[in-house]
Curated annotation (Swiss-Prot):
GO biological-process terms attached to the record: box H/ACA sno(s)RNA 3'-end processing; mRNA pseudouridine synthesis; rRNA pseudouridine synthesis; snRNA pseudouridine synthesis; tRNA pseudouridine synthesis
Protein name: Probable tRNA pseudouridine synthase B
Membership in a protein family: Belongs to the pseudouridine synthase TruB family. Type 2 subfamily.
Catalytic activity reported: uridine(55) in tRNA = pseudouridine(55) in tRNA
Record-linked InterPro entries: Dyskerin-like, PsdUridine_synth_cat_dom_sf, PsdUridine_synth_N, PUA, PUA-like_sf, PUA_sf, tRNA_PsdUridine_synth_B_fam, TruB_arch
Keywords: Isomerase, tRNA processing
Classification via PANTHER family: CENTROMERE/MICROTUBULE BINDING PROTEIN CBF5, H_ACA RIBONUCLEOPROTEIN COMPLEX SUBUNIT DKC1
Record has Isomerase as a keyword: yes
Gene3D superfamilies: Pseudouridine synthase, PUA domain
Domain of life according to the entry: Archaea
Length: 336
């Protein structure tokens, strides 16, 4: 009997070595390290990674999170069908703006597939190899999107176990890949037919299975804080929104540039203190403060080398601002 349970995954190393363009310091009188926000602000700019149980819809889970924390707004990223379990990140309040960025990295699942006729491990591995890379996929009949043919990338297909006609495998794939349809297509390629028996998501963007908590854990943590003033558990189960943006390359700006960006300005070369290696033109980048706070996201108009060598010009076209205006003092002048 093959069961889908929690698996151990490697810890993500989110410490990136940045290139210094200009040595500057930050003023600790305003702003703060995202992990040291007041608990009320952590909730306002936070993410709860729920271990979704079998049964409820993803929308129901988001609603429960909103009710538990007494919030006005909460939203999930990457819908899971009611019968599917696993990693479901739920953004809280202001952090809901970051959800579109969660779909950039691939997702990972562990799937139990049932073959309608037996097949050898050798044949299964051969077909897995054929399905690794870019594949054509038409969404299933019950999908909430138009059933047009789409291209999706399968990064990895790994056979974990086989017990008769039951096949347990891990798949790392592009966001928007239908695993149910993948099982059917694999069965067709094997000549056996197949269907998805069980599915568990183990990773969604930067959020891993090790980050996931049960809804009861969230409720208990909230009660501990409200009734006893104990923040420890709530800080454990709520991640700052920056945690879900670690996959993006960074452009770190000076304190003097932050409020201008919050008011809609683009990122100019003169306002940059540090940046990631290997930024390419047109790439989506995260604009951060020197304390590690997410200010905005935008498209890079220059690559890393060009930003380092430039003395003026727009480096990042800002597309979405996350930080509230007034978090940092205004240090810019209006044009007359």
């Amino acid at each position: 009997m093959i069961l889908l349970e929690k698996t151990q995954e490697k810890k993500i190393n989110d410490k990136e070595e940045l290139i210094v363009k200009e040595e500057v310091e930050t003023n600790w009188d305003y702003g703060c390290n995202p992990y040291e926000r007041k608990i009320e602000d952590l909730i306002k700019y936070g993410v709860v990674v729920v271990d979704k149980p079998r049964g409820p819809t993803s929308h129901e889970v988001s609603t429960w999170v909103k009710k538990i924390l007494n919030l006005d707004k909460a939203g999930h990223g990457g819908t899971l069908d009611p019968k599917v379990t696993g990693v479901l990140p739920v953004a809280l309040e202001r952090a809901t703006k970051t959800i579109p960025m969660w779909h950039i990295p691939p997702k990972e699942y562990v799937c139990l597939m049932h073959l309608h006729r037996d097949a050898s491990e050798e044949d299964i591995l051969r077909v897995f190899k054929e399905f690794t890379g870019r594949i054509y996929q038409r969404p299933p009949l019950k999908a909430a999107v138009k059933r047009r043919l789409r291209i999706r990338k399968i990064h990895e297909l790994e056979l974990l176990d086989k017990d008769g006609k039951d096949v347990l495998f891990r798949v790392k794939c592009q966001s928007g890949t239908y695993i149910r349809k993948l099982c059917e297509d694999i069965g067709e390629a094997l000549g056996t037919s197949a269907h998805m028996q069980e599915l568990r998501r183990t990773k969604s963007g930067c959020f891993e299975e090790k980050d996931a908590v049960y809804l009861q854990d969230l409720l208990d943590a909230y009660v501990f804080w409200k009734e006893d003033g104990d923040e420890e558990e709530l800080r454990r189960v709520i991640k700052p929104m920056e945690y879900g943006l670690r996959h993006l390359k960074k452009v770190v700006v000076k304190d003097s540039a932050v409020d201008a960006i919050c008011h809609g300005a683009d990122v100019y070369v003169r306002g940059i203190a540090k940046l990631s290696k290997g930024i390419g033109k047109g790439e989506t980048v995260l604009v951060e403060t020197l304390k590690g706070e997410a200010v905005a996201v935008g498209k890079a108009l220059m690559n890393t080398k060009e930003i380092l060598n430039a003395d003026k010009g727009v480096a990042v076209d800002v597309e979405r601002v996350y930080m509230d205006r007034g978090t940092y003092p205004r240090m810019w002048k209006r044009k007359k």
